[in-house]
């Protein structure tokens, strides 16, 4: 056979040329994930965590990472809304993580840059409630002499 009778096109990637190319379906799309399964698989192989990496491992890891990211972002978005802000900043991330029991335990040893600290006042330092109880539950009225109350 001479070169003129070949039907394969150059750059066809090892497949027979001619027809329209089928749209590629990534493993992330197959798994219904936003996180990149292929990239995570590459990192697992390149990192030499094990001699061999199964086909399901990067899918599972991508799903776990996506879930954790969604959880943290949801709580941080709520913290931003509580502070009347539209943009999530590191402070909101810190408040979200530290106020959630399970995430706080997971990220106990993690320092979030520019996150600040949780607001916390020791109960001993707070004013005592017994002062108010001695007056019968009512605050003493203080009126200034010479001033009449405002009329509506």
UniProtKB/Swiss-Prot annotation:
Its main location: nucleus. It is found in: Nucleus; Chromosome. GO terms for cellular component: nucleosome; nucleus. Residues 7-25 have a biased composition (Basic residues). CDD domains: HFD_H2A. Keywords: Chromosome, DNA-binding, Nucleosome core, Nucleus. Residues 129-142 have a biased composition (Basic and acidic residues). InterPro entries: Histone-fold (IPR009072), Histone_H2A (IPR002119), Histone_H2A/H2B/H3 (IPR007125), Histone_H2A_C (IPR032454), Histone_H2A_CS (IPR032458). Belongs to the histone H2A family. A motif (SPKK motif) lies at residues 148-151. It comes from the Eukaryota. The keyword Nucleus applies. Coiled coil: none annotated. The keyword Nucleus applies. SMART domains: H2A. Residues 1-25, 129-152 are annotated as: Disordered. It comes from Medicago truncatula (Barrel medic). One of its GO terms (molecular function) is structural constituent of chromatin. The nucleosome is a histone octamer containing two molecules each of H2A, H2B, H3 and H4 assembled in one H3-H4 heterotetramer and two H2A-H2B heterodimers. The octamer wraps approximately 147 bp of DNA. Contains one SPKK motif which may interact with the minor groove of A/T-rich DNA sites. Phosphorylation of this motif may regulate DNA binding. This motif is reiterated in both termini of histone H1 and in the N-terminus of sea urchin histones H2B, but its presence in the C-terminus seems to be unique to plant H2A. This is Probable histone H2A.3. Gene3D superfamilies: Histone, subunit A. Core component of nucleosome. Nucleosomes wrap and compact DNA into chromatin, limiting DNA accessibility to the cellular machineries which require DNA as a template. Histones thereby play a central role in transcription regulation, DNA repair, DNA replication and chromosomal stability. DNA accessibility is regulated via a complex set of post-translational modifications of histones, also called histone code, and nucleosome remodeling.
